[in-house]
């Protein structure tokens, strides 16, 4: 076969190469931050209320202050720091998110290979026997060998940006996985801290319940002695026994909850239940952060991993629309080949070999596909609208989370103040009731009511103390957790690339 030089091919190639890289479809623009000046209707200028008890310190809101990367260190609890570090290093959810990010990045790099020509080499050798009868001739058959080698190059010109948009989509997916990793790390660290606080709260409730049981047991001994002396009726003894039994019945559920909480802490640290973590907690050993950094509303959309992930999804949908539009335009292909053929491998690269080469350019224009391409474009537009709405919903949820946390901090500070007053009042009332009962001034039923009130107030006080801590965790989590200030290597360099 004879190949003739086509003088127009180089000019055509130059023109197509010049056009390559022009991408159809909308270029992505990150949504601007919401035009709001605060998280709540009124400015946060006042500190929270304070109470003279564990977790009762006043907290101050510092607008515009950045959140530290290891925000849990603000609680000044070394055991808590160790547990969070263990969890971030060993939890399988983190490892899965890291692997998903690596996978997405490799797929994006693989997609980027379409920017370059494809070069392939081939080699074949065969030995054949033919008969003259196959050619309509008489005679004996002939045996011969054929060896060929070739090098082929093909290149799809990205004239309308289908490749560019596909790579853009893959890179946006990698960004999505990056922020999914950040969200996983934030959720994990928050869950560990909250689980530790729940551990401390349950231990406080158990301690209070045991103290109440001890006091009620002592009171039962007193009542029994009085019954022996004829000072009280048997009904009073039975009433005290019933009260003590009811209080004792509240202890096993608390101990069960503590055991389950220990299992949760162990699992979060990436361990099996039989490998229980050594760290234990009490509210008294954990400081309540008094200076609370509150980032500016304009920064929240950049700081929240879930908002950034939603933006990456929006970016991906935007790129997919570009791909769908580009698929409706012509596709241009350049290809070239060079090779040789000989009657044996030994002669393949010698003077006896026959040279082979080819050079071609092609264009494919979609004409009719049953409406597939048009519907794919419309589907991509709908997907972009969906992602935009989901992004807006994520932003609204982010601002609501911050507002909820701020409200909870203020309200629960007042609750603790009131609960402390209630506990102290109930304690004083119980002491007075015991003295009055001993003096015969009140009925035993009045004393029992005072005991029940004090028991409830002790447990409620511990719960109110724990709420101050969990509200603080909720604020740090709602503001994004300071991942941009992280210095640890939990996710190596994958967290910030």
Q: Residues of each region from the PLM?
A:
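Sec/SRP-type N-terminal targeting helices
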Residues: 96, 112-113, 157-185, 235, ...
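Acidic, low-complexity, intrinsically disordered peripheral segments
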Residues: 263, 273, 288, 460-497
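Bacterial N-terminal signal peptides that target proteins for export
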Residues: 1-12
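Small/polar, glycine/serine/threonine/aspartate-rich low-complexity segments that form flexible
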Residues: 60-62, 66-75, 85, 124-152, ...
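Bacterial Sec-pathway N-terminal export signals of envelope proteins
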Residues: 23-108, 285-315, 366-367, 392-395, ...
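C-terminal motif of bacterial Sec signal peptides marking the signal peptidase cleavage site
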Residues: 19-21
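Periplasmic alpha-helical coiled-coil/stalk elements that build and connect Gram-negative outer-membrane
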Residues: 163, 179-296, 408, 412, ...
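Amphipathic alpha-helical coiled-coil scaffold segments and their short linker/junction regions
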Residues: 60-61, 65, 73, 88-91, ...
């Amino acid at each position: 076969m004879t190949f003739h030089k086509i003088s127009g091919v180089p000019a055509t190639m130059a023109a197509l190469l010049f056009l390559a890289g022009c991408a159809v479809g909308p270029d992505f623009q990150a949504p601007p931050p919401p035009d709001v000046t605060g998280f709540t209707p009124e400015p946060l200028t006042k500190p929270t209320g304070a109470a003279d008890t564990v977790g009762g310190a006043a907290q101050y809101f510092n607008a515009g202050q950045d959140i530290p990367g290891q925000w849990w260190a603000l609680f000044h609890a070394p055991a808590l720091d160790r547990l969070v570090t263990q969890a971030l290093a060993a939890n399988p959810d983190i490892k899965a998110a890291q692997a998903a990010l690596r996978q997405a990045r490799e797929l994006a790099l693989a997609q980027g290979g379409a920017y370059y020509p494809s070069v392939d080499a081939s080699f074949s050798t065969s030995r054949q026997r033919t008969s003259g009868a196959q050619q309509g001739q008489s005679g004996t058959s002939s045996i011969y060998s054929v060896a060929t080698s070739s090098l082929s190059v093909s290149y799809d010109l990205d004239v309308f940006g289908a490749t560019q948009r596909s790579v853009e989509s893959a890179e946006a997916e990698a960004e999505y996985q990056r922020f999914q990793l950040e969200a996983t790390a934030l959720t994990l660290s928050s869950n560990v801290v909250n689980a530790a606080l729940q551990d401390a709260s349950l231990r406080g409730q158990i301690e209070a319940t045991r103290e109440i049981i001890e006091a009620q047991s002592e009171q039962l001994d007193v009542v029994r002695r009085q019954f022996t002396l004829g000072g009280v009726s048997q009904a009073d003894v039975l009433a005290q026994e019933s009260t003590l039994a009811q209080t004792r019945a509240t202890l096993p559920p608390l101990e069960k909850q503590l055991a389950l909480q220990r299992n949760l802490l162990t699992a979060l640290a990436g361990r099996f239940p039989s490998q229980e973590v050594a760290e234990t907690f009490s509210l008294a050993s954990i400081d309540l952060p008094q200076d609370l950094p509150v980032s500016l509303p304009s920064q929240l959309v950049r700081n929240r991993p879930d908002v950034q992930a939603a933006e990456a999804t929006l970016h991906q949908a935007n790129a997919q629309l570009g791909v769908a539009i580009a698929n409706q335009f012509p596709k241009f292909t350049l290809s070239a080949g060079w090779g040789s053929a000989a009657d044996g491998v030994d002669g393949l690269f010698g003077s006896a070999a026959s040279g082979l080469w080819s050079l071609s350019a092609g264009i494919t224009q979609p004409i009719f596909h049953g409406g597939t391409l048009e519907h794919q474009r419309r589907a991509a537009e709908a997907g972009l609208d969906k992602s935009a709405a989901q992004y807006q919903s994520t932003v609204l949820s982010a601002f609501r989370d911050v507002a909820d946390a701020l409200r909870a901090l203020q309200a629960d500070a007042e609750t603790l103040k009131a609960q402390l007053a209630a506990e102290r009042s109930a304690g004083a009332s119980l002491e007075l009731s015991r003295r009055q009962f001993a003096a015969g001034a009140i009925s035993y039923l009045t004393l029992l009511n005072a005991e029940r009130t004090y028991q409830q107030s002790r447990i409620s006080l511990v719960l109110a103390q724990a709420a101050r801590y969990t509200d603080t965790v909720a604020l740090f989590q709602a503001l994004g957790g300071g991942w941009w200030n992280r210095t640890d290597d939990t996710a190596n360099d994958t967290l910030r690339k």
